């Protein structure tokens, strides 16, 4: 066991005070200083302040501009919805509880916060997987005469919600459970204990394999094949400056997408697996809190990578924010026209995140 276990909680083992109090009833300032809880609350406020506008704006701009309502963009809207789930279901709750220094909302609140935060995170995770598959299918054309349409896009959305629910619902019905984690003011899946009757061992293995390793393999495979296809298309044309520039742009986008995926999920999954496989080892409350920051901050950098990097989305956002006029339209239009001719086969429009 990695700490002091109580009814539906587990206080981390590294606790120099020797005090153990229920995180549902008492402030946990004996674990870390009140300043750390204030910093956590401020960080959550920052995520809300930035994450809500950029994700809400994504939905609003798509509704306002008909040209954005294409099947390939459906998954990006799904990603924005997932981020809003995390903002309202996770960040607001954590900000409120961190101001009190413990999970003041009780056991029911812990279940709700853990569920919505996990659901939003998993929808986001599987949206990135579906996004990679869609780009691979559209660019690499592994299926001849296949035309990606609205029905395929809707199937992709349904798939993300099914996979997310298959991860977020089981802890509510007895396969594992949601408990306060890290600094004890936010809730997540129980990686810490092997509590009798909850089958935590099998659920953690299931989560690690089906909701981390498999998505990771799929993302690497799809983007790896996509890069190969882009390089082959570039090699088949004359090695002109425009072709090389388009190839570099696509490569840069793919690398950023993969790095964003790893930054989001690798720290959290690695630490959770370490805690689970090293029962009895000592770790402090910050050991699990800090990796969770990376996963939570995806609500900001996912839109930046997958939406703001896309010229069409970016131009429409600027037009909306500037009351119907884009002051940068001429510059971007000129640069787009200059690079369209010879680089059409490696055009980033099929690869970029929209």
From Swiss-Prot:
A single MF term (Gene Ontology): 11-cis retinal binding
Site feature (Plays an important role in the conformation switch to the active conformation) residues: 113
Subcellular location per the Swiss-Prot or TrEMBL entry: Membrane; Cell projection, Cilium, Photoreceptor outer segment
Biased composition annotated in UniProt, kind: Low complexity: 334-354
Pfam families (alphabetical): 7tm_1 (PF00001), Rhodopsin_N (PF10413)
Alphabetized InterPro entries for the sequence: GPCR_opsins (IPR050125), GPCR_Rhodpsn (IPR000276), GPCR_Rhodpsn_7TM (IPR017452), Opsin (IPR001760), Retinal_BS (IPR027430), Rhodopsin (IPR000732), Rhodopsin_N (IPR019477)
Transmembrane segments: 37-61, 74-96, 111-133, 153-173, 203-224, 253-274, 287-308
Keywords recorded for this protein, A-Z: Cell projection, Chromophore, Disulfide bond, G-protein coupled receptor, Glycoprotein, Lipoprotein, Membrane, Palmitate, Phosphoprotein, Photoreceptor protein, Receptor, Retinal protein, Sensory transduction, Transducer, Transmembrane, Transmembrane helix, Vision
Chain ranges for the short sequence motif 'Ionic lock' involved in activated form stabilization as given in the UniProt record: 134-136
Disulfide bond annotation, renumbered to this chain: 110-187
Region (Disordered): 332-354
Glycosites: 2, 15
Modified residues (N6-(retinylidene)lysine): 296
UniProt-listed PANTHER family: OPSIN
Job of this protein: Photoreceptor required for image-forming vision at low light intensity. While most salt water fish species use retinal as chromophore, most freshwater fish use 3-dehydroretinal, or a mixture of retinal and 3-dehydroretinal. Light-induced isomerization of 11-cis to all-trans retinal triggers a conformational change that activates signaling via G-proteins. Subsequent receptor phosphorylation mediates displacement of the bound G-protein alpha subunit by arrestin and terminates signaling.
Similarity comment: Belongs to the G-protein coupled receptor 1 family. Opsin subfamily.
Protein name: Rhodopsin
